[in-house]
Curated annotation (Swiss-Prot):
It comes from Serratia proteamaculans (strain 568). GO terms for molecular function: exodeoxyribonuclease VII activity; nucleic acid binding. It catalyses: Exonucleolytic cleavage in either 5'- to 3'- or 3'- to 5'-direction to yield nucleoside 5'-phosphates. This is Exodeoxyribonuclease 7 large subunit. Bidirectionally degrades single-stranded DNA into large acid-insoluble oligonucleotides, which are then degraded further into small acid-soluble oligonucleotides. The lineage of its organism: Bacteria, Pseudomonadati, Pseudomonadota, Gammaproteobacteria, Enterobacterales. Belongs to the XseA family. GO terms for biological process: DNA catabolic process. The gene is xseA. GO terms for cellular component: cytoplasm; exodeoxyribonuclease VII complex. It is found in: Cytoplasm. The keyword Metal-binding does not apply. InterPro entries: Exonuc_VII_L (IPR003753), Exonuc_VII_lsu_C (IPR020579), OB-fold_nuc-bd_dom (IPR025824). Its main location: cytoplasm. Keywords: Cytoplasm, Exonuclease, Hydrolase, Nuclease.
Length: 458
């Protein structure tokens, strides 16, 4: 049975052609928000992928000459905004989209803007290490730029109160989220630099989404941080959150609490250091006294082994010098200890640990008194031992024998004259008396008569 030819009867190819023309003329170009899936890039360089939402999907192509202008590479699961034309592929009767442009949507767009700004500022040198300022150690006053009602400020204040309650804090309240937040943060940084009230700044906020933290990815904030004369610690969000402010700041802290730890001193650690220094000082003083005592013992031993008065006098002079140096050294050590104690008291006074200072001061005074008493006892003992040594030397000295009326005579040859056989008439003899020397000439030599021994009775 043959069918009549009528204009209302289409062939398949004509139908597909008509539908394609209708779609292209009626729809034109549209903007589509969707998720990418089934992304592929064959050797031709064209992109083929599917755009979908939770209820439908459509095929899409983006030709090589067009996708070259795209600033990112699409990934499966990424949300995008696509400007495309609707067409129909006539051989299969499938309609599809031909993409003309594509950009990330939502967080994807923000991430693209983040990467572009990061690359540009890095090229300008704003992230270079040579521009990083060192943090003051210790900080004398800390400035905090954050929301006055946020959890970040509460965390910072709590940490500073625990670690260093005497550290002054200046708060520069500002918005940290919203369209006005970047400008307010910039003004707070400029105000802190103009007033010059603190020597380190903490700039940050608590955690949140990428959009919540976006104020700290603003170029104006980055340049204000870079221009700050006061060192800045960035403390934005949690440890996994990274912002442009973190790259520009002089130091990045993973959280606001960690930033407070970095800029503050540990009061307990200072007390431990003071105790350690006191122990080292006491050990040094004990070592110094032991060395001086050993030195005195060696000198005293040498004096006991040497008999002549001249050497004894030299050793006595040296002993006096050493005694003076010992006394001066101890006085210097005591003065140095006193100055260290005064400096420690001043530092502790600023932190108001009055009770511990009073106890340590009493201990230092007790140690000083004990040291002086020990030194005086030791010096008195040394003086007594020295006097005994001098008395012993005087007792065995030849000069003591001469003082009792005896004399010593020498021949011209330097021999001690003991018998008449050593002397000759006309020789000059030299006689040592208590108070000097006498020279005499031998006139005659007379032998002393030996006493006769009585014969034994027969």
């Amino acid at each position: 049975m043959s069918l009549p030819v009528s204009p209302s009867i289409f062939t398949v190819s004509r139908l597909n052609q008509t539908v394609r023309q209708l779609l292209e003329m009626e729809m034109g170009q549209i903007w589509l928000s969707a998720e990418i899936s089934n992304f592929s890039q064959p050797s031709s360089g064209h992109w083929y992928f599917t755009l979908k939402d939770d209820r439908a999907q459509v095929r899409c192509a983006m030709f090589r000459n067009t996708n070259r202008r795209t600033t990112f590479r699409p990934q499966n699961g990424q949300q995008v905004l696509v400007r495309a034309s609707i067409t129909l592929y006539e051989p299969r009767g499938d309609y599809q989209l031909i993409a003309e442009s594509m950009q990330p949507a939502g967080d994807g767009l923000l991430q693209q803007q983040f990467d572009q700004l990061k690359q540009r500022l890095s090229a300008e040198g704003l992230f270079d290490q040579q521009f990083k300022q060192p943090l003051p150690s210790p900080a004398k006053r800390v400035g905090v730029i954050t929301s006055a009602s946020g959890a970040a400020l509460h965390d910072v204040l709590q940490v500073l109160q625990r670690r260093d309650p005497s550290l002054p804090i200046i708060i520069y309240p500002t918005s940290v989220q919203g369209a006005e937040a970047p400008l307010q943060i910039v003004r707070a940084i400029e105000t802190a630099n103009r007033r010059d009230e603190c020597d380190v700044l903490i700039v940050g906020r608590g955690g949140g989404s990428l959009e919540d933290l976006w104020s700290f990815n603003d170029e104006r904030v980055a340049r204000a941080i870079f221009a700050s004369r006061i060192p800045i610690v960035s403390a934005v969000g949690h440890e996994t959150d990274v912002t442009i402010a973190d790259f520009v700041a002089d130091l990045r802290a993973p959280t606001p609490s960690a930033a407070a730890e970095l800029v503050s001193r540990n009061q307990l650690e200072l007390l431990r250091q003071l105790q350690s220094q006191q122990q080292r000082m006491e050990m040094a003083m004990d070592y110094y006294l032991a060395q001086r005592q050993q030195q005195f013992t060696r000198i005293n031993h040498r004096l006991q082994q040497q008999h002549p008065h001249l050497r004894l006098a030299r050793q006595q002079t040296l002993l006096f010098k050493l005694q003076r140096r010992l006394e001066d050294g101890m006085q210097n050590q005591l003065r140095l200890s006193s100055r260290r104690s005064e400096r420690a008291q001043q530092r502790l006074a600023q932190m108001q640990p009055q009770a511990r200072i009073h106890r340590y001061q009493q201990r230092v005074q007790q140690q000083e008194y004990r040291l002086q008493q020990a030194l005086e006892r030791q010096l008195n003992a040394w003086r007594q031992r020295f006097g005994v040594a001098c008395s012993q030397l005087e007792a065995v000295s030849p000069l003591a024998t001469l003082a009792r009326g005896y004399s010593v005579t020498q021949t011209p040859r330097g021999e001690l004259l003991k018998t008449t056989k050593q002397a000759q008439v006309g020789e000059l003899l030299k006689t040592r008396l208590q108070d000097g020397w006498v020279e005499s000439e031998v006139k005659t030599i007379t032998l002393a008569k030996k006493p006769r021994k009585k014969r034994a009775a027969e």
